[in-house]
From Swiss-Prot:
One of its GO terms (molecular function) is NADP binding. This is Glutamyl-tRNA reductase. Substrate binds at residues 51-54, 110, 115-117, 121. It comes from Francisella tularensis subsp. tularensis (strain SCHU S4 / Schu 4). Its EC number is 1.2.1.70. The gene is hemA.
Length: 416
């Protein structure tokens, strides 16, 4: 059976958080998901990946028309009927799927360029697919090559070491000031796009606690709900939250300072304000125990890393392209070897039956020379039957390229 490799994706590039939340498959019974998707006609194998920034389904299928059935399956898990998957999903096919998965596992498709968490998430998805007997040989080979590629990118580049955004750079500054973030409490003010990105960076550092404060608590709750050490709060709770916090990062739209010196005591804190207009009073930095950074400080970090980022990303891309070429060459060899094996099996089948009949006749006293001549004639006819039919059909269709190919296969003169 000829199978095609495809993927369907909902990700942050096309879909905001509220859309991604609707189409997320995380939190559902994994075994049930695999049973239901594999029950769809023409779906042969599957791997389901669901993270905060994306939900993607990788599939081996026997008919491309099954895509519509898969979309219906996915839509069935959406709580709000106003969200239609056809408005948001991206379809990839063949080599594009493998290239995307390699870039994804290496962190090149992430909100945070080079972030390492995605590789672990891809590995977890692969493991769950195997556990549910949902992965086939070809898809397995794809993922093994992806993991090897990601390992090589990690060892041969510094793609995960260069701050690539205001949010990531802000966290870099915070790390410089505090030795052991795992014992610290972090307060993020604002749950917009930058606030969400800050939250993702902070979770990667595994602090003791993350507090996310926002005007509307619902948005903050959507972001924090999947994390045990995270909590959502109203902006009105800031005085109490600041007392607990060791690091305060603001990314919020306000017209006046929402954190001033009156909120803080003698406890040392790191204040990082990436809001415009500023949300944290710069005078906080004048207090001896505090460290204060604003957008200009962060931009300096970004500027320092521009060339590094470009260079490391370019190195990673070259490794991925090379790795994809290696994979495709190996797949060609596998397909070729499989075809050769099948050809020999076919030949064995043609020869064995005729040979046994011929030997039986010789054992029964028939003329051996005549039997061997007849055997050779029958084998010649059987072996050449399908090639002759193929050549006639190619000639009818004007496929001179096929004729040339078949001539080469049989060592014939292609010039005639």
């Amino acid at each position: 059976m000829n199978m095609a490799l495809i993927s369907l994706a909902i990700d942050y590039k096309k879909s905001p958080i509220e859309v991604r939340s609707e189409f997320a498959l995380s939190g559902l019974d994994v075994s049930m998901l695999y049973r239901s998707i594999l029950a769809i006609d023409n779906v042969v194998h599957a791997v389901i990946l669901s993270t905060c920034n994306r939900t993607e389904v990788y599939l081996e299928i026997s008919d491309l028309r099954v895509v519509d059935d898969i979309l219906v399956w996915w839509q069935g898990y959406v709580r709000n009927p106003n969200y239609k998957i056809k408005d948001y999903f991206k379809l990839r096919q063949g080599t594009e799927v493998i290239m995307h998965l390699m870039k994804l596992a290496c962190g090149l498709e992430s909100m945070v360029l080079g972030e390492p968490q995605i590789l672990g998430q891809v590995k977890d998805s692969y493991t769950l697919s195997k556990k549910n007997h949902a992965i086939g040989k070809e898809l397995d080979r794809v993922f093994q090559k992806v993991f090897a590629t990601a390992k090589r990118v990690r060892s041969e580049t510094r793609i995960g070491h260069c701050p690539v955004s205001v949010a990531f750079s802000a966290i870099t500054l915070a790390k410089r000031q505090l030795d052991n973030i795992s014992s610290k409490n972090v307060l993020i003010i604002g749950a917009g796009q930058t606030g969400e990105l800050l939250f993702r960076h902070v979770t990667a550092l595994a602090p003791k606690q993350i507090m996310l404060a926002n005007r509307t608590i619902e948005k903050a709750q959507k972001i924090t709900s999947a994390f045990r050490n995270a909590s959502a709060h109203y902006l009105s709770e800031l005085p109490q939250l600041i007392k607990k916090a060791d690091i305060i990062i603001a990314a919020v739209n306000v017209l006046e300072y929402i954190v001033t010196c009156k909120y803080v005591g003698d406890k040392p804190r790191v204040f990082i304000d990436i809001s415009i207009p500023q949300a944290l009073d710069p005078k906080l930095g004048e207090l001896e125990q505090n460290v204060y950074y604003c957008v200009d400080d962060i931009n300096a970090v970004i500027e320092d890393n521009k060339d590094k980022r470009k260079y490391e990303s370019s190195k990673a891309q070259k490794i991925i392209v090379k790795s994809l070429e290696e994979y495709l060459e190996k797949e060609k060899a596998i397909i070729s070897n499989s075809a050769i094996k099948e050809l020999f099996q076919k030949a064995d089948g043609l020869v064995d039956l005729s040979l046994e009949k011929s030997l039986a006749k010789i054992r029964n006293g028939k003329d051996a020379e005549e039997i061997i001549k007849r055997f050779a004639y029958e084998i010649k006819k059987k072996v050449l039957h399908y090639p002759v039919v193929g050549m006639k059909e190619a000639s009818k269709q004007g496929r001179s390229d096929c004729l040339v190919c078949m001539k080469r296969m049989f060592g014939l003169n292609v010039e005639k």
